[in-house]
Amino acid sequence: MPTTLYFVRHGVTDWNAARRLAGRLAGVSLSGDGRREAEAVARRLAAVPLRAVVSSPLDRARETAETIARPHELRVVVDEAFQEREYAAWQGLFSSDIHARFPDDVRAVAGGQTVAGVESVASMAERMWAGMERLAAEHPDGAVAVVSHADPIRALIARVASVPPERLRAITIDTASVSRIRRRGPRAIVDYANSRAHLEGPGACGWPSPQQSGAV
C-alpha cells in the first residue's frame, strides 16, 4: 500500500483578499473566512485515518494544520521543507506594486526562469519532494496531511506530473484546497489537485475530481 499525502493550502488571510504578498513574513494569520475554510477541510479529512499532520512554520499554515489535527488528537509537526516560497524584495508588497516595480522579473518568474532573490521552481520542487520522501518513510502505508502554500504545492505537483516550469501557473492551488498524492517506492501519482468540494459542493474540484478517482 502507498503512503497517501493530502497537501492542503492554508485558509485565506486578509493579505490574500487584498492581493498582498505575505511570503515568509511572520504574523500573517487566517481571517474569519480562513478559519471557516480550515474547519471545512478538517471536516473533510476527519474520516481519514491520519497518522500525522505536518505544517509549514508560518502562522497561517499552522493555524490551518491545528484545525485539521484537532479531530485526530494529533500534534502538528512543523517542517521547513513545506515552507512558503522565498520572494525576497516582493514580500509585503501588493500585487500591483510588484508588477509596477519589477515587471521584467515578474515576466521571467512567470516563464519559469530564475530571478535573483526569488526561489526557483526547481528548489521548491526539490525540498517538497524530499519532505514527501521523508514522510513516506516515516509513515509507510499511512495517510498524512501537509499544510503548505500555493507555489510549493504547485512545484511538487509539476514535478510529479512532469509539468515544465513555464507552465507552473497553469496549476491552480486555491486557499483551503486539497491535492492528493500517493507515494509508493520511487513513484508518486497525483490523484487530484485543487479540490474544494468541501467548500463549494459536489463538482467544485480540480484535476481530476475526487469522485472520479474514488478519493476523499
Where on the chain are the PLM-derived regions?
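Short basic (Lys/Arg) and small-residue
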Residues: 149
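Generic structural signal for well-ordered alpha-helical scaffold segments
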Residues: 39-46, 125, 129-137, 157
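Active-site-proximal alpha-helix that buttresses catalytic centers in soluble enzyme cores
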Residues: 3, 8-74, 78, 101
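Phosphate-handling substructures
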Residues: 29, 71-129, 189-195, 202-212, ...
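Short active-site segment of divalent metal-dependent hydrolases/proteases
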Residues: 13, 152-153
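Acidic, low-complexity terminal tails and accessory targeting/binding regions
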Residues: 1-3, 85-96, 137, 142-143, ...
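Active-site signature of alpha/beta-hydrolase-fold catalytic machinery across serine-
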Residues: 67, 155-159
